[in-house]
């Protein structure tokens, strides 16, 4: 099987479901909470969560009474999220590429990309698709990283990796440079016909494990 950026990304996240849910989801959940509160999403709305992971935004939207469809490239993430969405019969998670959504135009009242858009090989395609599937007057919440290596801990890890004798050809940590600045994000959304209501920088705490269990599989 030929390896593509999508399959590499899926394999990466398939291998870290437990660690992601424990250590990464609390940060994503805080950002998702802020994004949801800045919209009018409520019971009965149809919400799309793009790059949903283990459900940081999906679970909060479901608790509001929204009908949520969550998508992710990682089949393991999707399986975990479907387990967690079981109490919400109107909600489900699907394996799908956010750069090529299979939904009709104007399907959703709101769509969210929390820390996922900049992971796409073609973030512009992902943004195009998110805009396409939201109805006129609906909500689109985009939460990119505000620095090129993501959370502060990733900066520390990146520096540490550079000091290790890694095998030839080992990939570098991805640079999450797309949509970092408020100006760039606003311009990208306005170019796609969106009325931008707010663009803010948010600092949120990131929970870290103790050193003895920091890296595990």
Question: Language-model segments: what does each one mean?
Answer:
Residues 1-45, 56-60, 77-84, 158, ...:
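Conserved class I S-adenosyl-L-methionine
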Residues 124-139:
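A short glycine-rich, Lys/Arg-flanked "PGG" loop and its adjoining helix->strand segment in the class I
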Residues 46-101:
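Class I SAM-dependent methyltransferase SAM/SAH-binding core
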Residues 99-111:
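A short acidic, Gly/Pro-enriched loop at the edge of an enzyme's catalytic core
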Residues 139-209:
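Conserved catalytic/acceptor-binding region of the Class I
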Residues 110-124, 146:
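A short SAM/SAH-binding and catalytic strip from SAM-dependent methyltransferases
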Residues 9, 16, 197-217:
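C-terminal helical/coil "lid" or tail adjacent to the Rossmann-like core of SAM-dependent
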């Amino acid at each position: 099987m030929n390896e593509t950026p999508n399959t590499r990304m899926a394999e990466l996240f398939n291998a870290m479901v437990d660690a992601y849910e424990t250590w990464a989801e609390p940060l994503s959940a805080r950002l998702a909470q802020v994004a949801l509160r800045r919209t009018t999403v409520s019971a009965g709305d149809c919400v799309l969560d793009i790059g949903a992971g283990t459900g940081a935004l999906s679970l909060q939207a479901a608790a509001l009474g929204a009908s949520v469809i969550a998508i992710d490239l990682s089949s393991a993430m999707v399986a975990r999220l479907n387990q967690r969405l079981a109490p919400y019969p109107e909600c489900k998670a699907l394996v799908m590429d956010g750069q090529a959504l299979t939904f009709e135009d104007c399907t959703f009242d709101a769509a969210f990309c929390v820390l996922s858009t900049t992971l796409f090989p073609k973030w512009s395609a992902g943004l195009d698709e998110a805009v396409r599937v939201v109805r006129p007057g609906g909500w689109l919440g985009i939460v990119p990283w505000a620095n090129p290596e993501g959370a502060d801990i990733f900066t520390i890890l990146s520096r540490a990796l550079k000091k290790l004798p890694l095998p030839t050809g080992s990939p570098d940590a991805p640079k999450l440079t797309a949509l970092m600045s408020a100006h760039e994000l606003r311009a990208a959304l306005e170019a796609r016909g969106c009325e931008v209501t707010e663009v803010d920088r948010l600092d949120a705490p990131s929970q870290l494990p103790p050193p003895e269990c920091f890296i595990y599989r």
